[in-house]
């Protein structure tokens, strides 16, 4: 794999109805219904909305035999109206349901964590090697008949591993690790290969973007070693809604698409299913438009480990680099110093002039030729100003530099001036590739100057800014290169809708939180809902956010059902999980505190629980 130059991973083609995936096919877009699969009319109507929005596959929850059998009616109704979209049955806990669904759906998703193994209980189990091998043989004995049904019906399958539903068996041997998630998948893949069943798609998902990216990278590596080329389905589970859902999804999925991984994408938003499609389409189009870009001659640093990257070692300069959290640098070239108190930047790049009334305590960056040592101001240099750096008596200096600008003169200057913080800039079609090449060259030269990434856009829609900036930063954060972000946006044309500076600042902070390197607000782990969700998910999320959005650093899980609920919420402080029609269970960490609370009382009960444990503060 060339991490500097974009190209898609070569995969085998999988036939899914009339819409094949992998091989030379484009990256496919999909979503999932949240209606009851026994309600034919509701499912058909929602599937049509997904297709009309651009969706190429529609997945439906299939929790029982009745739901599996009704896929035939849903399929027939769609085709009668000219909708030839392949249907995907989503099966958990019951392999018999998968057997039935394979007769009516174009693809069946099974979850290795609960296909044969018992549902996760978080208990540690002890196995001898022989006992463990026997458990794997049980999978083979049950899985092969299912594969035979799929062969007979020309049905594809997805082996869909979720971080939140790994079995106790896998957890006990491998722990809560990427290695465990990958092995959970490989157990099934090896059976498929042995049985010569190749219409297989794979997914490994998590709500934690770092775990999700590292695990998919590892899976692709292991498959390559074993000669497997199955296509990959990408997604961040429980990404949430609104800006959080878009930023988290774009960061995680974008980091993988940037490396050519991924043959189909689902952006899991806690919104109407059809709302996911435009977001996924924008993300895929943005990442794939860099194909055939000019070559980037990067050299991977020997100490860099792609499968398990660690933060690049840097020297702290004031509060940048070293062990410090990544900083946010805002741009205020027009003198506007209006900030959101929750998302106040660490530094402000003011360009050619300081504001008339600087904010006390705010740190300003101004162009070096205008800097005269004012308090709380720091000079910024361009590459052509390197000869003058030594003449400035400042303990913190910024240097705007491109990858090609990192020449012998710049390297010599940086070795002599550890107080310089680099601000990477690029106009290359594959900006991420150049930024990676710059970071690796710094390591190759033994330079420890902190590195901030200048991400600039010309967007009139907030969603576009969120998707593109998060996708561009994902791999840089996960690879350990990010000591800060400078996010700047200009509208495309005069008179266009201007995205406010405060929204741009909030986006920068949101990216760092989605990458799990800096927390600035409450974090919500909320699923998109499906046919198993028996309460009003969207309105519930809105009510919980309204009551808790000021609780910085608190993690709250809001889950439709127990399939991934307790598992994906494992690192959440509190959890709100559907327990039946109109019933909710509340969790503190992994412990269920109260069960079967009426839906209309549950949000208030959640707030009471947070207050009882001393984690609630008034606004």
PLM feature segments, named:
Residues 52-57, 105, 197, 261-262, ...:
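A structural motif
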């Amino acid at each position: 794999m060339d991490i500097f130059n974009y190209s898609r991973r070569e995969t085998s083609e999988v036939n899914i109805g009339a819409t094949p995936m992998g091989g030379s096919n484009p990256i496919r877009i999909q979503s999932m219904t949240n209606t009851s699969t026994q309600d034919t009319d509701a499912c058909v109507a929602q599937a049509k909305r997904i297709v009309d929005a651009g969706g190429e596959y529609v997945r439906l929850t299939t929790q029982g035999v009745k739901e599996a059998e009704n896929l035939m009616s849903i399929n027939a109704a769609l085709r009668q109206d000219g909708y030839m979209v392949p249907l995907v049955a989503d099966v958990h806990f019951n392999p018999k349901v998968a057997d039935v669904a394979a007769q009516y759906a174009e693809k069946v998703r099974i979850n290795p964590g609960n296909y044969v193994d018992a549902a996760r209980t978080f208990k540690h189990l002890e196995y001898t090697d022989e006992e463990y091998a026997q458990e794997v043989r049980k999978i083979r004995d049950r899985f092969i008949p299912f594969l035979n049904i799929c062969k007979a019906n020309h049905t594809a399958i997805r082996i869909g591993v979720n971080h939140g539903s790994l079995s106790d068996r896998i957890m006990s041997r491998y722990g809560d690790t990427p290695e465990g998630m990958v092995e959970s998948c490989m157990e099934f893949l090896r059976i498929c290969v042995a049985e010569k069943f190749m219409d297989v798609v794979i997914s490994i998902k998590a709500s934690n973007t770092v775990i999700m990216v590292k695990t998919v990278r590892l899976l692709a590596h292991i498959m390559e070693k074993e000669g497997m080329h199955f296509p990959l389905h990408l997604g961040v589970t429980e990404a949430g809604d609104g800006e959080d859902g878009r930023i988290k999804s774009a960061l995680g999925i974008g980091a993988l698409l940037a490396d050519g991984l991924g043959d189909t994408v689902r952006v899991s938003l806690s919104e109407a299913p059809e709302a996911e499609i435009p977001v996924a389409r924008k993300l895929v189009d943005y990442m794939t438009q860099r194909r055939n870009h000019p070559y980037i001659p990067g050299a991977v640093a020997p100490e860099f480990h792609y499968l398990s990257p660690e933060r690049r070692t840097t020297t702290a300069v004031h509060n940048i680099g070293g062990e410090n959290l990544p900083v946010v640098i805002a741009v205020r070239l027009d003198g506007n110093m209006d900030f959101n108190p929750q998302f106040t930047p660490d530094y402000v790049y003011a360009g050619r002039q300081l504001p008339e009334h600087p904010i006390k305590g705010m740190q300003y960056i101004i162009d070096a030729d205008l800097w005269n040592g004012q308090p709380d101001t720091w000079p910024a240099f361009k590459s052509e100003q390197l000869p003058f750096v030594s003449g400035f008596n400042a303990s913190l200096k910024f240097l705007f530099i491109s990858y090609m600008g990192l020449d012998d003169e710049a390297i010599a200057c940086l070795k002599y001036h550890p107080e310089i913080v680099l601000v990477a800039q690029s106009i290359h079609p594959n900006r991420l590739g150049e930024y990676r090449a710059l970071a690796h060259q710094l390591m190759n030269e033994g330079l420890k100057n902190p590195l901030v990434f200048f991400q600039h856009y010309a967007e009139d829609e907030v969603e576009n800014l969120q998707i593109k900036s998060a996708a561009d930063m994902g791999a840089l954060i996960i690879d350990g290169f990010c000591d800060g972000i400078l996010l700047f946006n200009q509208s495309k044309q005069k008179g266009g809708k201007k995205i406010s500076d405060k929204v741009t600042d909030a986006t920068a902070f949101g990216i760092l939180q989605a990458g799990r390197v800096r927390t600035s607000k409450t974090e919500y782990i909320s699923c998109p809902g499906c046919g198993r969700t028996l309460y009003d998910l969207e309105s519930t999320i809105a009510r919980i956010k309204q009551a808790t959005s000021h609780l910085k650093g608190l993690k709250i899980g809001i889950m439709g059902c127990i399939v991934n609920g307790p598992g994906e919420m494992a690192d959440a402080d509190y959890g709100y999980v559907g327990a039946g029609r109109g019933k909710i269970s509340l969790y503190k960490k992994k412990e269920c505190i109260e069960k079967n609370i009426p839906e209309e009382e549950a949000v208030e009960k959640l707030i009471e629980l947070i207050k009882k444990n001393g984690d609630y503060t008034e606004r």
